[in-house]
Amino acid sequence: MTAIDDARYMDLALALAQAQQGRTAPNPAVGCVLVRQGRIIATGATQDGGRPHAERVALDAAGDQAAGATAYVTLEPCAHHGQTPPCAEGLVQAGVARVVIACQDEYHEVAGRGVAILSDAGIVIETGLRKAAATALYCGFFQRLSSGLPQVAVDLRAGLYDAELTAATPEAAKAQIHAFSAAGMNRVRVAPDHPLAGLDWAGLLNT
């Protein structure tokens, strides 16, 4: 596989993740592409509500063809036993030969452990491909992990957004924004004529 091929497959994984943004809370939206002998054999994205995870979706679709394949994932595969088994272990059990990861997961129960599981199993690991794009995709998730606060960007243009602010007071707006964050929504629109359009949002979120 060439570097151009790697970038193309990771771009597809990022697009799959982006398409699920705002639908996977409390988990981040992840994309996964499985490639074998230069051919895409399966794709997956984190499903609504946060599970199944992207890797599980792709592995289930690929079946036995996953053996010897390369997996392109936008975020480090999970390593802990929660409501589902670790995706890192699933990749090992499926016989995946190589895993390309865009960025490391900052969640304390993963944070390098997923990579360690894969590496210990003899899987070739490459990290950092399209890292900037992946970090931008997960900026809200990482912010919530580090501070407990949502990361909110206010766009006054009527473009694509996950939700629209309707609260009319700062107190109500704060509650509504945190509700949006809990639901995994990252892009909130404030209409230009909204009474809170000129509010200091950083101050709002930290009060």
Language-model-detected regions and their locations in the chain:
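Local cysteine-cluster metal-coordination motifs and their immediate loop/turn environment
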Residues: 52-53, 71-90, 109
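A short, polar/charged loop-to-alpha-helix boundary motif
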Residues: 47-60
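Short hydrophobic alpha-helix segments
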Residues: 42-44
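Short beta-strand scaffold segments in enzyme catalytic cores
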Residues: 29-38
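Short loop/turn motifs at secondary-structure junctions and domain boundaries
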Residues: 22-26
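Short helix-loop-beta connector
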Residues: 65-69
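Short, flexible loop segments at the rims of nucleotide/cofactor-binding pockets, characterized by
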Residues: 49, 76-79, 165-169
